[in-house]
């Protein structure tokens, strides 16, 4: 199987995407905040602080701080579990969906602007 993208190309693309996102997107999220946001949108629910902490191998307080920021930006929403008040579910929002769509579009655009990257599967 031929290499689709080299490690150098991957780092170059990452650098371009991060730089473009700082210029063009409305939010400057940390890696942890981005990981939580992507987990909520890319993995099947339910999403709780507890399972997010376990799957990302990050402390519950750190996940709570990330969710605090994401909630204030309306990228995710907290919802109390009616059956177990200790649990808090994390839910998607329209604003979060739009942000991630724009972020994905930015990644695709930057990848297309790198002539040496083969975007087709090998």
For each feature predicted by the language model, list its residue ranges.
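Amphipathic alpha-helical dimerization/coiled-coil segments
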Residues: 18-21, 101-122
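N-terminal helix-turn-helix DNA-binding core of bacterial DNA-binding proteins
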Residues: 19-58
